[in-house]
Design a protein with these regions (language model features):
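Asp-box/BNR beta-propeller blade signature and adjacent active/binding-site loops
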Residues: 33-405
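N-terminal secretory signal peptides that target proteins for export/translocation
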Residues: 1-13
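Sec/Tat signal peptide C-region and signal peptidase I cleavage site
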Residues: 29-31
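Intrinsically disordered and other compositionally biased segments
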Residues: 6-9, 24, 324
Length: 405
């Protein structure tokens, strides 16, 4: 009797344990079908003595490490000043973050910003960081500018833990002088992209006004066909002419057909983003046009393609403050500057031809953002909020507002 009782208890416990495992797996599946939006601060103002963190960028390595980076504005909130580039790494999909790394600039210090109208004799401005994950080599190429006048690249081959010495690549911008005598150069901001042929492409903007001005400006790309060993200039994608006023701060992504879609900020009258496409990412750009669904509050935006290998079909995602300026009657003010708030995300199933389901990530103060995705399809958005840079984690169910995607 004792043996039989023990045996029955053992069988009961085993069956109960298996039932718990089954229910746990079932609840996990149910949870995967539910919408997800959660947030964590990554770069709050005041951390490490930094007055303000701005200009976020984000990539996910081939091994799934999340790299978040931005400008660390040491002494002021201004674009010009003592600025470094800081980075944090996440090994759990953006839920927790390792300590801050100061990754640029670690070459010869270059003070006395020649592009600043007044002051700055002892300042070094490191600006506009852009990372690209080379999915053929696993390395991370990282570009940034110095004093809005010179451009450098560094590389990591260990998931962003250590970085190479900087190499200057300013010569890549010289061909643009044939059309515009630029005085200011800037990469991105945000992230670059890699085409199916291995080419690395980074959006850039250049300005040719008076010292201290970021306008008039125009947009193009630089590229590397040898895994970041050498960089060259592409053709101008969005010139400063006609109805396109001072285009700058572009973001690009690949399309389902292997081409490149470029989305550009400007101060043009329609208050809409400028879009153009290219099959190569460097030339043959289509005639720029304003996209009626992409509002322009005069703020950098992010765009990202999630390939059909992750979901059943390709998605393009787009984030920016969904705002335009309006008068007291609610009528749009041409060439107005919308308030930087209401950071929203929308998606496209047709390579950016049309956009659906505008969802609000941050209703309050919010501005620049950058998008990435994890191998399991979780979408990450690193964005500027009120005195902080935050990482939002979300799934496609939340973005589309539909379950079972």
């Amino acid at each position: 009797m004792i043996v039989r009782t023990v045996h029955l208890r053992w069988v009961f416990h085993c069956r109960f344990f298996l039932l718990i495992l089954f229910l746990a797996s079932l609840s996990g599946q149910l949870f995967a079908d539910e919408s997800l939006l959660e947030k964590v601060e990554v770069f709050p103002a005041g951390m490490n003595g930094v007055t303000l963190y701005r200009i976020p960028g984000m990539v996910v390595t081939t091994n799934g490490t999340v790299l978040a980076y931005c400008e660390a504005r040491r002494d002021s909130r201004a674009d010009w000043g003592e600025i470094e580039v800081h980075l944090r790494r996440s090994l759990d999909g953006g839920k927790t973050w390792l300590p801050v790394q100061h990754i640029a600039h670690h070459g010869e210090r270059m003070e006395g910003n020649p592009r600043k109208a007044t002051g700055g004799e002892t300042e070094q401005t490191v600006n506009n960081p852009v990372a690209i994950v080379d999915r053929e080599t696993g390395a991370i190429e990282f570009l940034y500018c110095l004093n809005y006048a010179r451009c450098f690249s560094i590389r990591s081959e260990d998931e962003g833990e250590t970085w190479s010495k900087p190499i200057e690549i300013t010569d890549a911008f010289q061909p643009f002088r044939k059309r515009y005598p630029w005085k200011v150069i800037a990469t991105g901001p945000g992230h670059g992209t890699q085409l199916s042929n291995g080419r690395l492409v980074v959006p850039v903007w250049l300005a040719y006004g008076d010292v201290g001005d970021h306008s008039p400006s125009f947009c193009g790309t630089i590229y590397s066909d040898d895994h970041g060993g050498n960089w060259e200039a592409g053709q101008i994608a969005v010139p400063n002419e006609g109805e396109f006023h001072h285009p700058n701060e572009s973001m690009l992504t690949t399309t389902s057909q292997g081409g490149v879609l470029l989305v550009t900020r400007s101060v043009s009258r329609p208050n809409r983003k400028i879009v153009t496409t290219s099959s190569t990412g460097i030339d043959g750009w289509s005639a720029p046009r304003f996209h009626p669904q992409l509002l322009e509050p005069v703020c950098m935006a992010s765009i990202l393609r999630i390939p059909k290998e992750i979901f059943a079909h390709d998605f393009l995602l787009f984030t920016n403050p969904h705002e335009v300026s309006r008068d007291e009657k609610g009528v749009e003010i041409p060439a107005g500057r919308g308030k930087r708030r209401n950071l929203s995300i929308k998606y496209s199933r047709d390579d950016g031809g049309s956009w659906e389901s505008t969802r609000t990530i941050e209703a309050g103060a919010s501005a620049y953002s950058d998008l990435a995705y994890l191998p399991d399809g979780t979408v990450l958005c690193l964005y500027e909020g009120d005195q902080t840079i935050t990482c939002a984690r979300m799934n496609i169910q939340w973005i589309t507002g539909k379950q079972g995607q």
